[in-house]
Amino acid sequence: MKHITVLLKPTEECNIRCEYCYHADTQYTKGRMSIEMFEEVIEKISHSYDHITLTFHGGEPLLMGYDFYVKAFEIINKHRKDKEWHISIQTNGILLDEKFCELFETNGFSASISFDGPGELNQLRASTEYLTNKIIDLRSKGYKIDLLGVITKRNILRLSEYYNFCKKYGCHLRLNPVSKSGGAKNDNDYLITSEDYVAAIKELFPVWMQDETADFIFDPLSSFTYMALLDRHAPICEYCGCLPKWLSISCDGSIYQCSLSYPEEYYLGNIKDYTDISQAFDHNNFRELLKGAIQRRFHCKESCDYYSLCQGGCNNESILNGDLTKPAGFKCKTFRIVIPFIKEYWENHQGEVRNPHVLEMLKRFGDGKYNDK
C-alpha cells in the first residue's frame, strides 16, 4: 500500500499563547482554509495514496468550528472507498467538548490534547486547571483522549506527576523535548540538555517497567523500549525516514515537509499548483532537502551502530542545529545512552517487568522471542 501522512493546518490562528511555541516567530498568521480548498486537498491526496494518515493541526484547529468538521467528514467519507484512512486532531483542548467528541468518535476520529501536566505544570500553556478538569470530565464520560506534552526545564524533574495523572485517567501520552525554535529558540528557561533528558528517562524507566497497572502508551519510553528490545525503528516520524511520505499543508495551501519550523528555502509549492499531491515531491526544494538528508544518513550509517533504529534522525532538528547534512547532537547523545541502558535493564531485571503494555508489545512484535514473558 502506498502511504502518506498529511498534517493539515486549517488555520494558524490560536486562542492561547504558549510561551515556548515553535510557531511564535510566525505571529500566528491569520486566515482559515475554505471548505472548497479542503475538498481540493482531500481529492489530491486520494489520487495517489491508498493508506492515508491525516492529522488536523495548527494553530488551533477547533477554531474552525463544529460545522467545518461536519462538512469535512462528509468530504472524507466520499473518498474512503477502497482506502485506509487514519484521522486525528491535535488540539489545545480549550474548545473541545462533548459535541466535538461525539462527532469525532462517530467518524472514527481520535483527539489528542496538548497538555504539559496536571495543575501548575500546565501553566506553560496558559490554560491552568481548566484543561486538567476538562480532561478528567471527558474521560469520566468515556471519551478517548490522548495527550501530547512538551518537556522543558520547568517540568522535567516532575514527569512522575504527569505519568501518574495519565495512569489514573487512562490516557495515552507522548512527551517531546522542547523544540529549539519559536518562543524557546534562545530561552534557557525552557531548553533542556540531552543529559537532562537521559537522566529523566533513567529515573522513570524502572518505575514504568515494573508497574502492572500501566497499560497505556507512554512515549518516549514505549518507543525506546520498542527499538532497544525489538531491534527495529519505531513507527514515529523522527525515526521512520519521513521522506517522501510526509507533508504539511497550511490554510492557504502552502506545502512544507512537516508542521515544524521550516525556512522558506524548503517551501514545496501550493496545493493549487498540483493535480496530485505526490507532485510536491518533485519540487526542486524537496530534492535539495532529500539530498541533504541522504548525506546525513550516509554519515550516520557509516559511523553509528544505531542507524537502523534512528534512520539519521529528524530533518527539522538538523536544520535548527545549523546543518541538514549532520545529525542533531541532542538525539544522538540520547540514543547512544538510552538504548544500551534499556538492553542492560532487560538483561538484569526482566523478571521484574510487570508493565502489561510492554509485555503485550514484545509478544506482538517480537516474532516469538518474548512469548514466554
Predicted regions and their residues:
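Canonical Radical SAM [4Fe-4S] cluster-binding loop centered on the CxxxCxxC motif
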Residues: 1-36
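Cysteine-centered iron-sulfur cluster-binding motifs in ferredoxin-type domains/subunits
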Residues: 10-17, 60, 243, 299-303, ...
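General secretory precursor processing signal
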Residues: 17, 21, 169, 240-243, ...
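Radical SAM/AdoMet-radical enzyme domain recognition
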Residues: 39-55, 64-182, 187-192
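Radical SAM enzyme [4Fe-4S]-AdoMet core and its adjacent flexible, acidic
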Residues: 123-243, 248-252, 260-270
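Flexible mid-to-C-terminal extensions adjoining Fe-S/redox cofactors in radical SAM and related proteins
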Residues: 262-373
